[in-house]
Amino acid sequence: MSLISPLAAVLSAMAIVLGLLFFPNMTPQPTLHPRVGWRKEKASTLRAALRSCYKLNDWALEGYNAYAKLNIPYVLPSFDRGPITIIPARLMRRLYTLPDTDLDIRMTQQETNQTRWVAWDKKPAEDTFVWDVLRKQITRNLRQLTPIVASEIELSFNRWWGTDKEWKSIDIWDSCWKIVTGGINTTLCGSPLCRDAEFLQSCQNHSLVLVAGAMAINGAPRLLQPIIGGLVWFVCAILFNTTMKRSKAVVQERLEKTAMLRAEPAYDWKPPQDAIQWIIDDLYASDNLTQLNVKTICFRLLLLNDVSIPSTSFSVQTLLLNLFAADPALGFLEALREECQTVYTESGGVWTYDALKKLKITESAIRESLRLSPVGGIGLHRTVVNPKGISLPDYRLNLPHGTVIASPIESIHYDDDIYPHANDYNAFRFADPEAVRAILDKLSSEPNSNISTGGPRDRESKSAASTANIDEAFLAFGIGKHICPGRFFVMVEMKLILAIILVHYDVKPVKFKPKLVDCLWLKVPWNSGTLVVRRRSN
């Protein structure tokens, strides 16, 4: 199964053709920052934007080496977002900890996701419930959720990888997609929905169309966005109706039982700990009764899938390829298997939250894969919303109101000055405290200068040294105040998947690792690859 579906390809091609026909001949807006990717030619911005569909990540690396390593921001053309200012690593922490009144993330994400076109109900798509569920509820309940998720993932492996002792080939992307989706929905809605193949497939398809459709809408001229947006909305509506058909009975029953429990506290029913219940409880707590209906709750459930499935599935797939394509002589597999088998035995053959915390080498192997194979070449998009802009004169940083910024994630991750032998997969890299400290020092060091936003300096800003943690040793989960709220659950699920594989399966070394394809800022597994596996005799 390819990440780019036929529909996604059609939508992207349509946006490009319409852009060629209707984009005006534009030139870049004046800026103090150097530009990378433009040529001296007619319709330079349009033509640069079109080339960015396959050259953006190359330009990001070019600009990083030429400018960012000297702490100079630079500007890239982008088909889906227009000019983007790329921020050097040493300036990132200062910028990304600015208050939301200076640097916006919510409206930027809504623009990236094209919420106004792809969501039939704007309120749940634009409020903070997704982040509240991920950050507050799931993270808070990880200790109780981990054994349940582990059990479901083990069942998924039995189903998709099998229990045969003979070697067999499996499609990496397809199996990762199914296993990850089932594991996520164990937390979101529980059984039986987390095992409903039609429900899970519709969630997968919806998340794919959402990503591809949003990119196509962003790339189209404003005048024509309603056409592409209408097409994407129509397909998303069909897929949503499919998921709702499978989930509405569960949601309806939950609404009825919750109402009965609220009316009569002695009612004999214990609410499940899952996202459906957290959504219902949150709507009651906020007195948001207009959203307390089956359709809206089903839609909120789908949105949680949309933000979870694609990136986690991608990360699991690249983890398996990076690990099993590494030279066996390096001893990664032996060390990882010994660690997982030891912890699994000590925990009585049950994966618990405390057991997973002991998997230090396993966590390092996962983080190293996230470093080596980021979801995008650039990321962490934000928009300057301070009317006076943001400036750092000593470093020629001048960001007017409305400027879109991003970070050169892949370029930083492949910088040998930060990560020695950066092109190599080293499963032990993040298990070495001294190596992690050195990475933190490189990424968190700040220039001795103040950022000006036309007002008082942000008093909540703290020194990098006092607030640094391992999540800032690399940028897979972001940086600053809006770091990924679901990162703890992602690490739990990825640890479980890798540990279950190492304990229960043999995997032949991967001789050919498919290269990720650049599609704008995304890294796309066009050819997902295969693994040859068999169930271990233990």
UniProtKB/Swiss-Prot annotation:
Gene Ontology cellular-component terms listed = membrane
- Cite the EC number: 1.14.14.-
Q: Which cofactor does it need?
A: heme
Is GTP-binding there in the keyword field?
Answer: no
Positions that bind heme:
484
What protein family does this chain belong to?
Belongs to the cytochrome P450 family.
What name does UniProt use for this protein?
Cytochrome P450 monooxygenase okaG
Q: Which organism is it from?
A: Penicillium ochrochloron
